A protein has these predicted regions:
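A bilobed periplasmic-binding-protein/Venus flytrap-type ligand-binding module shared by bacterial periplasmic
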Residues: 126-133, 171-175, 248-261, 271, ...
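A ligand-binding cleft/hinge motif common to bilobed small-molecule-binding domains
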Residues: 83-90, 211, 216-235
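Periplasmic-binding protein-like
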Residues: 105, 123, 188-193, 199-200, ...
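Short beta-strand->loop
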Residues: 95-104, 117-118, 144-147, 217, ...
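Extracytoplasmic ligand-binding site segments that recognize negatively charged/polar headgroups
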Residues: 31-39, 75-214
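Mature extracytoplasmic/periplasmic domains
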Residues: 255-310
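Extracellular/periplasmic bilobal clamshell ligand-binding domains
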Residues: 297-334
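Early extracytoplasmic/lumenal segment of secretory-pathway proteins
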Residues: 23-88
Length: 334
């Protein structure tokens, strides 16, 4: 009987510990440590709020698919994804309205009026290059350069049918080559040509593969390239292609019927706080609130003249045509 009592007590203590741990947890889909320096942000969230957020390496599309699959019994509390996926999540009714502190300082076009999604930062798409892995080849300066045979097997872009940055790549290339959101023929033609150059097409962030030299050239955002160059001290260059590119926001949402809603709200409050926005700025992301980027960080960006080649698009329209583009890409390219 005494042994049984000790065993029961141990089980109860373990259960209480698990409950306590759960009480201090918020599950975030798509918070990978090697992307946008989420690793530092999550440590700051834990230190400031006491809420632990486990790392998660899904991409935007995988996160939305998981939310839809779990709609009847949600697992996640918050989700981070590209703006078009935020719009789709709202349409699928898998996210709830929440307006964090600092909400009023988010520009009107970068948040849902009811709080179902809101931007937290933005970045500009371009070409991230591990110069040492090029074997003496010049750093490509244009989308056209990536089609050259000398770069065969060296170029990577994330899957446009799943990852937001992949879809952004398609939209940017399409726009740069004369297409628009009603006509993706230029992008499809480009990816068909690039396919002959043996590209690498991962679904998740390939940051570490660029740093190792396994993937010398990656279509990616400025913030990842600057982090590689100035924080990880890699010989990495970032190029905004001569034909042009686009800048896009990333957004977050509170999951509908989140199991740890209060903790999820704390996470969302923090990423929009002065401290959270300052961390994004230090990670080379452009904060969505008017938080000053450190002078030394701003000085490491490409000149404004280069950024003049990056435009913006209608994100609502971009979301509306995303599914059709993905289907066409899978049918005609992949």
């Amino acid at each position: 009987m005494r042994v049984f009592s000790k065993t029961l007590a141990a089980v109860l203590l373990c259960g209480m510990a698990s409950l306590a741990q759960a009480a201090d947890t918020a599950i975030c889909y798509n918070c990978p440590p090697d992307w946008a320096d989420w690793g530092t942000q999550l440590k700051a969230i834990a230190a400031s709020t006491g809420v632990q957020v486990p790392l998660d390496n899904k991409n935007s599309g995988q996160s939305l698919a998981q939310l839809v699959a779990e709609k009847a019994a949600p697992v996640a509390d918050v989700v981070y994804y590209g703006v078009t996926f935020g719009l789709q999540a709202q349409k699928a009714e898998v996210v709830d309205g929440y307006k964090p502190k600092g909400w009023e300082q988010i520009p009107a076009g970068l948040k849902d009026p009811t709080g179902h999604w809101f931007a937290i930062h933005s970045g500009t798409l371009g070409i991230m290059v591990n110069v040492d892995a090029l074997g003496g080849l010049p750093v490509p300066q244009s989308w056209a350069d990536l089609l050259k045979p000398e770069y065969k097997g060296m170029v990577g872009y994330l899957d446009p049918s799943s990852a937001f940055v992949g879809y952004v790549s398609a939209v940017a290339i399409n726009r740069a080559l004369g297409g628009d959101l009603d006509n993706f023929a230029p992008a499809i033609d480009y990816f068909q040509k690039l396919a002959k150059n043996a590209p690498i097409v991962p679904k998740q962030t390939a940051y570490a593969r660029v740093l190792s030299g396994e993937l010398p050239i990656l279509v990616d955002y400025d913030f990842n390239a600057y982090r590689a160059r100035y924080k990880d001290n890699a010989n990495v260059a970032f190029v905004i292609p001569q034909e042009g590119s686009i800048s896009v926001p990333y957004v977050m949402s509170l999951v509908a019927n989140a199991p740890h809603r209060a903790n999820g709200e704390k996470v969302l409050d923090f990423v929009l706080s002065d401290a959270g926005q300052a961390l994004w700025a230090k990670a080379y992301l452009r904060p969505i609130r008017p938080v000053q980027m450190p002078t030394e960080v701003a000085a490491q960006f490409l000149p404004d003249g280069d950024y003049a080649r990056a435009g913006v698009v209608d994100y609502q329209k971009m979301a509306a045509v995303q599914e059709a583009f993905a289907a066409r890409y899978l049918n005609e390219v992949k």
